[in-house]
Swiss-Prot record:
Chief site of localization: mitochondrion
GO molecular function (one): protein folding chaperone
Cellular localisation: Mitochondrion matrix
Transit peptide as recorded in UniProt: 1-15
PANTHER family assigned: COMPLEX III ASSEMBLY FACTOR LYRM7 (PTHR46749:SF1)
Family per record: Belongs to the complex I LYR family. MZM1 subfamily.
Organism: Clavispora lusitaniae (strain ATCC 42720)
Keyword ATP-binding: no
Protein name per its UniProtKB record: Mitochondrial zinc maintenance protein 1, mitochondrial
Subunit structure of this chain's protein: Interacts with RIP1.
Record keywords: Chaperone, Mitochondrion, Transit peptide
Function: Assembly factor required for Rieske Fe-S protein RIP1 incorporation into the cytochrome b-c1 (CIII) complex. Functions as a chaperone, binding to this subunit within the mitochondrial matrix and stabilizing it prior to its translocation and insertion into the late CIII dimeric intermediate within the mitochondrial inner membrane. Modulates the mitochondrial matrix zinc pool.
Record keyword Glycoprotein present: no
Length: 115
């Protein structure tokens, strides 16, 4: 196993700790899945393929840290408390303020109905 692969693996494990802190079941499952992926690609010989897999693992780690937020339902209420940490990526609300026609997706498109 190459040094960059080992670094990516350790980074991914740290990312699971940040993303799933306090939820031992999910933490263990995520770590097992990462380990399984690492071991299944252990014997890759093609350097380009190894670099691709390392880059993918680094992307997964970054996604876990920035985009996964845990929530706990408040007892007796219909709302959740989110555990947002300092590394959580908070999006801009500017797209919410745009009209649906300007979003560039199907949100502003007229639906054609079959007759």
């Amino acid at each position: 196993m190459s040094n960059p692969a080992l670094q990516a693996y350790r980074t991914a494990l740290r990312a699971t700790r940040v993303a799933f802190n306090g939820d031992n079941f999910v933490l263990k499952s995520a770590r097992a899945k990462i380990r399984e992926g690492l071991l299944s690609n252990r014997d890759l010989a093609d350097k380009m393929e190894v670099e691709k897999k390392v880059a993918e693992l680094n992307e997964v780690a970054q996604f876990l840290v920035k985009n996964i937020v845990q929530g706990e339902k408040e007892e007796g209420k219909d709302r959740y408390l989110l555990k947002i940490h300092d590394k959580t990526e908070l999006g801009s609300n500017e797209t919410i303020k745009q009209s649906k026609a300007n979003l560039g997706s199907l949100a502003g498109a007229k639906v054609k109905r079959c007759s």
